[in-house]
């Protein structure tokens, strides 16, 4: 295996055995590809903005003598870059400019004569742009648009499973769901009549829609029924016989023909009888006259002599009618073939309940149902019906819908019109009737072949189209009203509705969510999330168990593990590692093709529908060298069931063992040994881990860590290979390799690093370089680590030495006992950055002012403010300190003449303003790390703002000039090379100042040309620099675009350092969570024979009942990894030669049965081996991939190599007494996470505060500075103790006895500790409520 330069620094030992046929795909492609499709020009007009424009334009005027046509569009450049947008609180977007053409036709002239054409580019609002990491910056905050899993358009056949009617009869229904437009439902009622609903309204007999489509009763019967023909000959009744129709019936008369009796009366007709009749080719049999009674005629019969209707189609025959027919000369009678078995008379029955009899009455009936209360006219009824399903503006099945529709009806072609045809409706009814007759199956709605993914691009396109349609109406009005000769396209288009629709979607749609930015994993998971909620989806209340359940088709598409606990369980899912969407939006997963019993490396992506026809082997099936299956019987999946198949039946094989799970679950080592419920908690809790001060790679990982860290975008990754030319904390410069340079560029890549910025969850984002000067790097190498990454690997927590044993009750009920050493070494110290903003507004009484001159505030409180009233950077502040001094004008009070005089003398201003300064919230303390001042255009900037501006300008200039220097140096080295090659002596050249070099002339023409080109580049570089500097200066000095009425905003950033403390929540990766109960002194912790104390003591009782044994295996393997690290460390300390080190490390990498990883250290230089050993001395990192991990024997081997007991248990001694514990204890290294549920954020106390308006009880919750609820159960407890006075105090003066509590406050102030409880306010509320019910309750004083 080839390792890049960075990967060689620390190679993770991989225990995986299955070959990696397919690399993990780029994890954010579902977001990026979808949005790319939305904004890129699509010549076909199938997707994105192009499709939206083409569907709405051209817009014609009502008269038809002018139209507005769409030509093309382009997106401009964004005004600010992503960082600037976040700082300023604006949206990162680009202006959309559309070229439109206004065509005016001659009025009197023949059709299509053009009078005038005007073309113009029109601004159509801003389109938010996606950042490189798949997010949007909306109003300064990063948001993610979550993909939606919704029911695919098409036709679905379903049943109520016997739940609707009391008899338990199964009622079938069909539903045609378009992409946009009205839903059409067909359903049976308990009497087996077929009904239709449009948009889930009142139901009508289904034949109404057929009549509205201009079918007569005869045609309807002809469509849905086979005919039975009776002939009257010589006063005898004969029937044309189709023997197959008799199957299963009982003969009501002797069936005979040609003098031979085939079936006797009363006998059941069997397949043998039918074969006999077919063999003898019996076509006609005589039937008794009574047999025809009750049959239904298939067409109208008219007496031709009188023109009188004898019987209408769909009438039941009686013997009288038969006689009449016979008399009027009708000898051949067509009736409908029905039976109770598989040809039900449903349509015939429905026609009997159908009140309409022609097209008009059917249309009117539909109109009445859709628009109750409006008087129907013929035109209105016709246009309404036409617009429902047959108009491209109002109805669209979409390509997906048409494909699903045709597949469902077993048609050959999969393309077709987006609107419905007569055949479509009739075929759906026919199929529904077939299902009712027992032929065919109903669909499974939860099958992933019937649910598709709607991603960002598609949802944005739909929203954009909504905006365009709103504009379309206005344009039509303007085209009809305005004077067309003076109008330009610009005058017709109002961009407001479009930008409003787009803004509404990105800002407040249910699927546009505030990004979860706790750590890189939570970002990636959020972008790969799939929600069934949202507009056009399900609602929490309506979703049943079936929708939430894991479905066989989820395999390899949606993760069966990662989903939230609580009301959203199963509705919000996560995309599996290898899953992707196909052109129709269905999820598909990759498989290896099996040809002639050999598993190839050819990869096919299959959707859930396609997969149903194949037999698919699991990824862990054993193969020999050639790729044949070793076992005769292989475990496979087929049609959603898992069973054994012989090896020659297999069509495909899974690509990887981790193809089933999502990214979050694939990071849990030994997932295969954990119970699913706990694995779910583990996957969810990894997303809540807070990035620690120093990231620490997991000793036991799964091999997915690098992919997640790199794809999440928190690290700086090399775009091109080269050599590190410069590196400091804030930037890395790479001199690019010659072969990767573009022609005519300096060949320098500059990476600016993010330093100490705030994430959405207030955690700290900071990048640190992990390369050093002169190192070679390749494309894709990690140059700098972000939060929670260590040498380019995801590192959410810390490796802790844990022991599983009880310790004095401090680990009762999942509590965790932690050593003081963990606090001393700052292992779980995290930095949180809070943003506090102070807004100065223009009020009715005058502007608010930001100043250090605040009334009634002592000197001490102002000590941390500068003269502008803003806190210094670096100040240590605690709760209640002033950060920004601000005064607000107060209403003028009438002054006495004396006061006026004093005011005039002393200029006292304190009385007419009140203090409204920004203070540090209670319970928060930290260091000010940054201050930003935003000033409205036209408002004078204060001193601090100017200082900040100057500093920013200096910094920008410094950055740009350094950048210029680096690029110049690159250029001049190339100029020097050309000059030296052209014959100039190097010594003389170096004595000459650099800017004079370009004045030299060369005799070699080719070299001279090269020199001139380089000179041009140099000028261009300087020009570019000036331009960039000017743009930067303009951006920094220009006023800010603030909300109406806002004059200034001051943002103060506080950094808070949080050490771990009792009450913080910690967890492992296997759903083993707990709260820290005590921080124990190091000397009291249990220690081993070498005197090494453990860091954490966990309760062994937390393991067996929860069945997450993965944590024990992780602990053992962690111990082995650490043991090997210790041996390497000892060798380094003894300064043993490189050969011995190389040999030992090689042994460690080679250990394990047929592992796929082959590390050959003989190809490494001594220096590389030493660096590798240096990085391994704290423990050799190990990968144990999901479902393909380390086996017990391998763990034991590794333990043996590290000179550790293979049981994984050692003897421990009590730190307090020095006595040995009575039995060996499992000790090892487990990866522990600190979760974002910190006790500092939850701790809260109140004495007096705000009260609820109606009940006068204290509010609840920390945010409202609320009280503690003394609930029902607590009242019972006090009642049980008989503590009457305490209870009285709780229910009155400490809660809602208004007079009592003020009195008590007064008493306490006076030093008199007595209380007088009165009437609780909520009791009065109760009285009022009872009175409102008409019961008068009065309290009488005795």
Curated annotation (Swiss-Prot):
Any one Gene Ontology cellular component term annotated for this protein: cytoplasm
Quaternary assembly: The RNAP catalytic core consists of 2 alpha, 1 beta, 1 beta' and 1 omega subunit. When a sigma factor is associated with the core the holoenzyme is formed, which can initiate transcription. The rRNA transcription and antitermination complex (rrnTAC) consists of RNAP, NusA, NusB, NusE (rpsJ), NusG, SubB, ribosomal protein S4, DNA and precursor rRNA; S4 is more flexible than other subunits. In pull-down experiments interacts with CedA.
Entry's EC annotation: 2.7.7.6
Protein name: DNA-directed RNA polymerase subunit beta
Family: Belongs to the RNA polymerase beta chain family.
Processing after translation: Acetylated on several lysine residues in the presence of glucose.
Catalytic activity reported: RNA(n) + a ribonucleoside 5'-triphosphate = RNA(n+1) + diphosphate
GO biological process, one term: cellular response to cell envelope stress
NCBIfam families tied to this protein: PRK00405.1 (NF001616), rpoB (TIGR02013)
Outcome, altering residue 561 to S: Resistant to antibiotics salinamide A and B
Alphabetical UniProt keywords: Acetylation, Antibiotic resistance, DNA-directed RNA polymerase, Nucleotidyltransferase, Transcription, Transferase
Cited InterPro entries: DNA-dir_RNA_pol_bsu_ext_1_sf, DNA-dir_RNA_pol_bsu_external_1, DNA-dir_RNA_pol_su2, DNA-dir_RNAP_su2_dom, DNA-dir_RNAP_su2_hyb_sf, RNA_pol_bsu_bac, RNA_pol_bsu_CS, RNA_pol_bsu_protrusion
CDD domains reported in the protein's UniProt record: RNA_pol_B_RPB2
Biological role: DNA-dependent RNA polymerase (RNAP) catalyzes the transcription of DNA into RNA using the four ribonucleoside triphosphates as substrates.
Biotechnology: Co-administration of salinamide and rifampicin or salinamide and myxopyronin suppresses the emergence of resistance to both antibiotics.
Gene3D superfamilies: 2.40.50.100, 2.40.50.150, 3.90.1100.10, 6.10.140.1670, DNA-directed RNA polymerase, beta subunit, external 1 domain, DNA-directed RNA polymerase, subunit 2, domain 6, RNA polymerase alpha subunit dimerisation domain, RNA polymerase Rpb2, domain 2
Residue(s) carrying N6-acetyllysine: 1022, 1200
GO molecular function annotation: DNA binding; DNA-directed RNA polymerase activity; ribonucleoside binding
């Amino acid at each position: 295996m080839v390792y890049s330069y960075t990967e060689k620094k620390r190679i993770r030992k991989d225990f995986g055995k299955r070959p990696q046929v397919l690399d993990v795909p780029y994890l954010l492609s579902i977001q990026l590809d979808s949005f790319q499709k939305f904004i890129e020009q699509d010549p076909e007009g199938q997707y994105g903005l192009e499709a939206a424009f083409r569907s709405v334009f051209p817009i014609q005027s009502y008269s038809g003598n002018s139209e507005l046509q769409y030509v093309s569009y382009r997106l401009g450049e964004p005004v600010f870059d992503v960082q600037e947008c976040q700082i300023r609180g604006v949206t990162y977007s680009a202006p959309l400019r559309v070229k439109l053409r206004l065509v005016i036709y001659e009025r009197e002239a023949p059709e299509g004569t053009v009078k005038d054409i005007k073309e113009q580019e029109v601004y159509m609002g801003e389109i938010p742009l996606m950042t490189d990491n798949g997010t949007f910056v909306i109003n300064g905050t990063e948001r993610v648009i979550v993909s939606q899993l919704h029911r695919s358009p098409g036709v679905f056949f379903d049943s109520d499973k016997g739940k609707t009617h009391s008899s338990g009869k199964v009622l079938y229904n069909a539903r045609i769901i378009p992409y946009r437009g009205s839903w059409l439902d067909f359903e049976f009622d308990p009497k087996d009549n077929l009904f239709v609903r449009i948009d889930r309204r009142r139901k009508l007999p289904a034949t109404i829609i057929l009549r509205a489509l201009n079918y007569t009763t005869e045609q309807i019967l002809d469509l849905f029924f086979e005919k039975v023909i009776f002939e009257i000959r010589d006063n005898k009744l004969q029937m044309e016989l189709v023997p197959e129709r008799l199957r299963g019936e009982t003969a009501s008369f002797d069936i005979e023909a040609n003098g031979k009796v085939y079936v006797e009366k009363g006998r059941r007709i069997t397949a043998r009888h039918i074969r006999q009749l077919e063999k003898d080719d019996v076509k006609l049999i005589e039937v008794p006259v009574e047999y025809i009674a009750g049959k239904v005629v298939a067409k109208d019969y008219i007496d031709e002599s009188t023109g009188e209707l004898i019987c209408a189609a769909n009438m039941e025959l009686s013997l009288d009618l038969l006689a009449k027919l016979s008399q009027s000369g009708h000898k051949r009678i067509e009736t409908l073939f029905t039976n109770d078995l598989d040809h039900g008379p449903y349509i015939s029955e429905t026609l009997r309940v159908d009140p309409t009899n022609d097209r008009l009455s059917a249309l009117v009936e539909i109109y009445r149902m859709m628009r109750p209360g409006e008087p129907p006219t013929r035109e209105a009824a016709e246009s309404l019906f036409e617009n429902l399903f047959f108009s491209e503006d109002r109805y669209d099945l979409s390509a997906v819908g048409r494909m699903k529709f045709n597949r469902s009806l077993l048609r050959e072609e999969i393309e077709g019109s987006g609107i419905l045809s007569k055949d479509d409706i009739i075929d759906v009814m026919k199929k529904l009737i077939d299902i009712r007759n027992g032929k065919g199956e109903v669909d499974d709605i939860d099958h992933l072949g019937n649910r598709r993914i709607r991603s960002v691009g598609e949802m944005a396109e739909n929203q954009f189209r909504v905006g365009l349609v709103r504009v379309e109406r206005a344009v039509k009005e303007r085209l009809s009203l305005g004077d067309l000769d003076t109008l330009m396209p610009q005058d017709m288009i109002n961009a407001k509705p479009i930008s409003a629709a787009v803004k509404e979607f990105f800002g407040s749609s249910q699927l546009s969510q505030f990004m979860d930015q706790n750590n890189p994993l939570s970002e990636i998971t959020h972008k790969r999330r799939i929600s069934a909620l949202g507009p056009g989806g399900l609602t929490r209340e309506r979703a049943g168990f079936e929708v939430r359940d894991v479905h066989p088709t989820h395999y390899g598409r949606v993760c069966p593990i990662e989903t939230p606990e609580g009301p959203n369980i199963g509705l919000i899912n996560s995309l599996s590692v290898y899953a992707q969407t196909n052109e129709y939006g269905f999820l598909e997963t990759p498989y290896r093709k099996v040809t002639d019993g050999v598993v190839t490396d050819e990869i096919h992506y299959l959707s859930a529908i396609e997969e149903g026809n194949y037999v698919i082997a699991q990824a862990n099936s054993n193969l020999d060298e050639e790729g044949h299956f070793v076992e005769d019987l292989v475990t496979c999946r087929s049609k959603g069931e898992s069973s054994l198949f012989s090896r020659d039946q297999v069509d495909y094989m899974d690509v990887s063992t981790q193809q089933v799970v999502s990214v979050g679950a694939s990071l849990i080592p030994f997932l295969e040994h954990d119970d699913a419920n706990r694995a779910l908690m583990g996957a969810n809790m990894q997303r809540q881990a807070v990035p620690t001060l120093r990231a620490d790679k997991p000793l036991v990982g799964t091999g997915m860590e690098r992919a997640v860290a790199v794809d999440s975008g928190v690290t700086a990754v090399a775009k091109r290979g080269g050599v590190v030319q410069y590196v400091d904390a804030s930037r890395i410069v790479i001199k690019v390799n010659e072969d990767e340079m573009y022609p005519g560029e300096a060949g320098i890549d500059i990476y600016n690093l993010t330093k100490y910025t705030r994430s959405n969850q207030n955690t700290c984002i900071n990048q640190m370089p992990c390369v050093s000067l002169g190192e070679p790097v390749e494309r894709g190498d990690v140059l700098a680590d972000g939060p929670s990454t260590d040498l380019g690997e995801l590192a959410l927590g810390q490796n802790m030495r844990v022991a599983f044993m009880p310790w004095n009750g401090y680990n009762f009920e999942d509590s965790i006992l932690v050593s003081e050493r963990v606090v001393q070494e700052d292992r779980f110290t995290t930095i949180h950055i809070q943003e506090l903003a102070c807004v100065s507004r223009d009020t009715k009484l005058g502007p608010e002012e930001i100043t250090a001159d605040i009334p009634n505030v002592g000197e001490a409180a102002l000590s941390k403010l500068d003269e502008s009233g803003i806190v210094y950077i670096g100040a240590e502040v605690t709760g209640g300190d002033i950060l920004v001094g601000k005064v607000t004008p107060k209403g003028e009070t009438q002054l006495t003449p004396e006061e006026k005089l004093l005011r005039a003398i002393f200029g006292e201003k304190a009385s007419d303003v009140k203090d409204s300064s920004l203070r540090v919230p209670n319970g928060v303390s930290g260091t000010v790390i940054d201050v930003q001042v935003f000033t409205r255009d036209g408002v004078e900037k204060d001193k601090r703002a100017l200082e900040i501006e100057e500093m920013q300008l200096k910094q920008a200039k410094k950055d740009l000039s350094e950048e210029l220097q680096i690029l110049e140096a690159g250029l001049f080295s190339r100029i020097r090379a050309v000059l030296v090659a052209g014959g100039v002596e190097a010594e003389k050249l170096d004595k000459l100042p650099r800017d004079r070099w370009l004045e030299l002339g060369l005799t070699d023409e080719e070299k001279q040309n090269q020199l001139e080109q380089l000179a041009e580049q140099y000028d261009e570089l300087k020009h570019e620099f000036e331009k960039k500097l000017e743009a930067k200066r303009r951006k920094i000095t220009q006023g800010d675009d603030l909300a109406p009425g806002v004059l200034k905003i001051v943002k103060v950033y506080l950094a808070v350092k949080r050490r771990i403390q009792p009450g913080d929540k910690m967890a492992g990766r296997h759903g083993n969570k707990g709260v820290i109960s005590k921080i124990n002194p190091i000397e009291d912790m249990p220690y081993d024979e070498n005197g090494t104390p453990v860091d954490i003591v966990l309760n062994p009782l937390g393991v067996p009942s929860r069945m997450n044994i993965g944590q024990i295996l992780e602990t053992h393997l962690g111990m082995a990894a650490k043991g090997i690290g210790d041996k390497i460390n000892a060798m380094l300390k003894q300064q043993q030669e490189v050969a011995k080190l190389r040999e030992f490390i090689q042994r460690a990498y080679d250990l394990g049965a047929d592992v796929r990883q082959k590390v050959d250290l003989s190809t490494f230089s001594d220096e590389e081996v030493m660096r590798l050993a240096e990085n391994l001395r704290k423990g050799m990192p190990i990968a144990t991939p999901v479902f393909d991990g380390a086996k017990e024997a391998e763990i034991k081997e590794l333990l043996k190599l590290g000179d550790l007991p293979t049981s994984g248990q050692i003897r421990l001694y009590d730190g307090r007494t020095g006595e040995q514990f009575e039995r060996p204890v499992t000790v090892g290294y487990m990866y522990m996470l600190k979760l974002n549920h910190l006790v500092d954020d939850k701790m809260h106390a109140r004495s007096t505060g705000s009260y609820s308006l109606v009940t006068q009880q204290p509010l609840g919750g920390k945010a409202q500075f609320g009280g503690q609820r003394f609930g029902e159960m607590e009242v019972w407890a006090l009642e049980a103790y008989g503590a009457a006075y305490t209870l009285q105090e709780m229910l009155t003066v400490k809660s809602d006895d208004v007079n009592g509590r003020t009195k008590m406050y007064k008493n306490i102030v006076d030093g008199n500790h007595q209380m007088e409880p009165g009437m609780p306010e909520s009791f009065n509320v109760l009285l009022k409520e009872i009175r409102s019910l008409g019961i008068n309750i009065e309290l009488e004083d005795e």
